[in-house]
Curated annotation (Swiss-Prot):
InterPro entries given in the database record: Bifunctional_GlmU, GlmU-like, Hexapep, Hexapep_transf_CS, MobA-like_NTP_Trfase, Nucleotide-diphossugar_trans, Trimer_LpxA-like_sf
Segments for region (N-acetyltransferase): 247-436
Name used for this protein in its record: Bifunctional protein GlmU
Ranges where the record places region Linker: 226-246
UniProtKB keywords: Acyltransferase, Cell shape, Cell wall biogenesis/degradation, Cytoplasm, Magnesium, Metal-binding, Multifunctional enzyme, Nucleotidyltransferase, Peptidoglycan synthesis, Repeat, Transferase
Residues that hold acetyl-CoA according to the record: N361, Y362, S380, A398, R415
Organism in which the protein naturally occurs: Campylobacter concisus (strain 13826)
Length: 436
């Protein structure tokens, strides 16, 4: 970790091209807001991280503080100091070096940032060789030093042929930035203070400016929802490739979605169209086709197909079949084969849950818990009206509605007694409808 470096993340923009009331940096990639992705990379190299906000400052700040409470938050004075350099004017600079990056670059890695921080120069900028440089500021390099960044509209024919372009991240020696920042003005068409002007000013003051060549994909900026989808696919591909190399078997991996916070242990199998959402931990388990797992722990179990495990469930040594939904359930050694809702429940080993079983956990005002002991047989089409406790070694007859606790060893049955009325079909429909 480099504690001599401060990192400033710029996240004050409106993000109008996202066409949403939601702040751009709170749009999620692989389950987490893009600002959180870049903060994770920043904190991998330093403890001194600041974020500059403006639009929806409180909302973004709240999300940041939930995960990184030590982050310093500053608000940009957009009325008086718009632009990328204007954002930095309100930040208390610290650290021997100041690294500036953007909150809408969620694919940037800590190794990329370290390369900028470790380069020996007064001003370090990031650049990449663009296959199609149209629209980018061209980086003019002479004798290994950056002389200028020339915008597309201002570039000569010779400069337009240059493929080295500005990637948008910078690292300054603090003393150099303190010299340069007051000299950046807003004498341009947009009347904004641009950090790109720092290169020209640094050269005028005889400071050393260099460029570090970076991976274009890692420095991709997100400006609209199409670019968001591209970035998410890049991140998904990387997550899945790493997991498969670590031993996770995936059927049709291109159809699978995995949250960036999910963890896998041992040998696991994910079939097609599976979604793993939130902070899941999955150990030695099979997740079958079209199942959704949310923020739960799955161990030594097979889930699905077409099952839904909702948040805060803990499932071990258990079979969950098709069209079974579990919410806040703790299941250990259980079989629930099909068509059941198991919410707010604890079910112990050896218990079989019949088709169509429902734990009725909500009375319209509050949620209640169902507890089922060991070696219980729950017949099909059973409703368990919580709060209710089922002891060990119990049989619950099919079609029962259980509203009271059941003691160990008992048969619980709650349904009308069957009565067969001979000849009723003919009496009801008539002789002509009786088929021989």
């Amino acid at each position: 970790m480099n504690n001599n470096t401060s990192i400033i993340i710029l996240a004050a923009g409106l993000g109008t091209r996202m066409k949403s009331k939601r702040p751009k940096v709170l749009f999620e990639l692989c389950g987490e807001p893009m600002i959180i992705h870049i903060l994770k990379q920043a904190y991998a190299i330093t403890n001194d991280v600041s974020v500059v906000l403006h639009y929806e400052k409180e909302l973004i700040s709240k999300k940041i503080k939930e995960i990184f409470p030590q982050t310093k938050i500053f608000e940009q004075d957009l009325a008086n100091f718009p632009g990328t350099a204007g954002a930095i004017k309100g930040v208390n600079l610290s650290g021997e070096k100041v690294l500036v990056t953007c909150g809408d670059m969620p694919l940037v890695r800590s190794t990329d940032l370290m390369r900028l921080a470790n380069a020996e120069a007064d001003v370090v900028m990031s650049s990449f060789e663009a296959a199609n440089p149209f629209g980018y500021g061209r980086v003019i390099i002479k004798n290994g030093k950056v002389e200028a960044i020339v915008e597309q509209k201002d570039a000569s024919e010779a400069q337009l042929a240059i493929k080295s372009v500005n990637a948008g991240c910078y690292c300054f020696k603090r003393e150099a930035l303190e010299q340069i920042l007051p000299l950046i003005n807003n004498q341009n068409a947009q009347k904004e203070y641009y950090l790109t002007d720092a290169i020209k000013i640094a050269n005028e003051k005889g400071l050393k400016c260099v460029a570090v060549n970076v991976n274009e994909q890692n420095f991709m900026g997100i400006n609209d929802k199409f670019q968001l989808s591209i970035a998410e696919k890049i991140m998904q591909d990387e997550i899945k490739q790493n997991l498969m190399k670590a031993g996770v078997l995936m059927r049709m991996p291109e159809s699978i979605f995995i949250d960036s916070r999910a963890k896998f242990e041992g040998e696991c199998v994910l079939e097609e169209n599976v979604s793993i959402l939130g902070e899941c931990v999955i150990t030695e388990s099979i997740i079958k086709s079209s199942s959704v797992i949310e923020s739960s722990v799955i161990k030594n179990s097979d889930i699905g197909p077409l099952a839904h495990i909702r948040p805060n469930s803990e499932i071990s040594d258990t079979h969950i079949g098709n069209f079974v939904e579990v919410k806040k359930g703790v299941l250990n050694g259980v079989k629930a084969g099909h068509l059941s809702y198991l919410g707010d429940c604890e079910i112990e080993s050896g218990t079989n849950i019949g088709c169509g079983t429902i734990t009725c956990n909500y009375d319209g005002k509050a949620k209640y818990k169902t507890k089922i002991g060991k070696n219980v047989f729950v017949g099909s089409d059973t409703q368990l009206v919580a709060p209710v406790n089922i002891a060990d070694n119990v049989i619950i007859a099919a079609g029962s509605t259980i509203t009271k606790d059941v003691e160990s060893g008992a048969l619980a049955i709650s349904r009308g007694r069957q009565e067969n009325k001979s000849g009723f079909f003919e009496k009801f429909f008539g002789k002509d409808d009786v088929k021989k």
